[in-house]
Amino acid sequence: ENGVTYNVYADPSGSDRPWALDPLPLIIAPEEWAKVSTAVAQRAKLLNAMLADLYGDQTLLSEGLLPPSLVFGQHGYLWPCRGIKPIGGIWLHNYAVDLARSPDGQWWVIADRTQAPSGAGYALENRLVVSQVFPEMFRDLHVQHLADFFHDQQDGLAALAPVEGDEQPHIVLLTPGPYNETYFEHAYLSRYLGFPLVEGQDLTGRGETLYLKTLRGL
């Protein structure tokens, strides 16, 4: 009813399907979740440190901890970024993990999502739907709000934008387009965060400046 979809182009029944939501949540004890969140944060710091090294001193390669072919053989390695120092030393700005329970009840990370992790927009929409389906339960249980996460994301992106004085930074949400499997989330987050939703063809470079094409020009 809310129009939430996830595009599945390998599905012979169609190019998209409704987003499935079980209104009954998976219950995780606070103590258990504290361990999970701490471990995931530690993992994110490790991956950020690895990126900083691979685009910096490359100690992991020189000491034989990682084979150079594993790094340089990847098309995703950005050679122009070699030697740069990002603001705050943060290379990994968005990170997600796929979690699963092991047979003995422990949590396992089965996938790291570092390139374009999806799910934040769907999580927000899920939360809104559940709050409408179970309004009293949602209120009485003092469910933690997600708004702080998105506010931090807005502030974090704004802090990365080089501006002068009181000038507001120009931030956009880049999407491959409506045929991407998570395009709904791109459009949803664009509206929620207040960032224009753009495709690569909407941008153009002039010297060291990136411009957004609009009906009024650049």
Spans of features found by a protein language model:
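Preference for protein termini
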Residues: E1-L218
